[in-house]
Amino acid sequence: MSLHRLLAALVFVSTIAHPALAQNVTDSHLQRIAAVKAVRVCIWPDYYSITYRNPRTQQLSGVDIDMANELGKDLGVGVQFVDSSFAKLIEDVTQDHCDVAMFAIGVTPLRAEKLRFTKPHLASDIFAITTKSNRRIKGWDDIDKSGTVVAVAKGTLHEPVMKSKLKAAQLLVLDTPFAREQEVQSGRADVFMTDYPYSQRFLANAEWARLVSPPGEYHVTPYAYAIKPGDDIWHARLERFVADIKRDGRLLASAKQHGLSLIVAH
């Protein structure tokens, strides 16, 4: 069923069953998407394996780039990518700068107060990156010690998690692109905290970097897509999309291509 026919059916059913809800249907993001024939998708273009823009070619790649394009195909519309970041996520979504944010967004209590999430499609624990030459950090237990500097990106889920977890180490919160990586490479910080997708791609491209993994589960976070609250119709359509890409194998195929099959949520 085309997007226009789907919307018409929803309007008809809502008007018959609940006349007061008809306006809600026509005010849905789906109505705007159908009208302009494009869905606006917020991404963080520095997210390796998820929504990464190659600085040389400007080409976008990653599992959520693939899934955004699949969403456009399912809706029968084009896809317009909108640059965002974790620091700007809530503002961009709630101010309607995009219809949906699709960059493996960790579902946290703070974000859940402001945004509405789909069911998760990925889930990742937290990992650390240090330099191969760092003598202070030999394993995970060396991170939370006096004198250690731990870098995180502002607005990421790692900021509140590490604020609550660290007891002895110093937390350094940075809000410019690749600042945490530069702090570690320069030696001003000992480690930066990240997730599985980013760590795998980063290690493949940074000869100086070394992965530090937790000995067991540290803080696994589900990743999902996020929209502005109050649009039940758009949320239901996205939930159907997430269920579809899990069932028909599109999500797993893309995850395998980008080396992320281990963190697909089932």
What are these regions (language model features)?
Residues 23-24, 157-172, 210-214, 243-266:
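Ligand-binding clefts/hinges and TM-proximal coupling segments of bilobed small-molecule sensing domains
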